[in-house]
Amino acid sequence: MADPVTVITTIYNGSRFIDGFARNLVQTLRAQDRAILLDDGSNPPLVLPEILRSDARIKLITAKRLGRGAALNLAIGNCKTGLIAIQDIDDLSLPGRLAAQADFLAARPDALSFTPAQSDWPIIRRKGSRQIAPSRLYVSNPFHHSSLAFHRDIWVGAGGYDTNLPCCIDLDFYLRAACRAGASFWQLDTPFIARNLDPAERFYAAIPSDIYRATLQTVLDRYRADVGFSHWMILAMMRTKLGIARGTRG
């Protein structure tokens, strides 16, 4: 039997998405997989639909408001499997995602494994899995955090997610995992997620731009020396001088 995966979803006032998410989660999980849903202080508290309440593979943890980084750490800390997959409540996993990423991580246990989304431009979808250097993230973030899968040992080695950042939590974790746990970044060639692209429905779209820019700079500066100099760093500096906005992903 292929290695089991635990799907981690943190939820804050996301009950409007729960029915669609529930149907998708049940379709996504294989017999050996598990899911931990962490209600991060929703008001009112999240109530699972019957399709999830009756599924022994799925666990709900209800917590006070922690913030996404601490909520992810609490959920992952409760995992019993060696493999973790992240999925937002408003995004959908596509058939075969967990099997594909579990197989990839069996061959590359040091990897953070990402996939494209259905909505990505075809030009950025390449045949075959490709490794992406950590310094590439200094130009833009090419990854969807809802597509991430990794070995739990990477999370342990990285020291978990940062619990104090107002945003850029995922970017920080990627660079933290590379610099502290020796993780490599890999993008599979098959789209395995469908994203919610409505900015009005995405929590971090409401972060004020000045807070985002300041936090982004803090995160990039935090790991710059460990990531090392490369042509990506040169390109990032050129874009900054030319006033070109940095690309981002969820």
Describe the role of every protein-language-model region.
Residues 39-48, 88-91:
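A conserved acidic beta->alpha catalytic loop
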Residues 96-125:
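Conserved donor NDP-sugar-binding/catalytic core segment of glycosyltransferases
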Residues 84:
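Short aromatic/hydrophobic "clamp" motif used to bind/position activated sugar donors
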Residues 23-32:
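Short, acidic, metal-binding catalytic loop of nucleotide-sugar glycosyltransferases
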Residues 167-173:
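Acidic donor-binding loop at a coil-to-helix junction in glycosyltransferase catalytic cores
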Residues 194-198, 203-231:
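Catalytic core of nucleotide-sugar-dependent glycosyltransferases
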Residues 116, 185-192:
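Catalytic beta-strand/loop signature of glycosyltransferases that borders the donor
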Residues 63-79:
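Glycine-rich, basic loop-to-helix element that forms the pyrophosphate-binding segment
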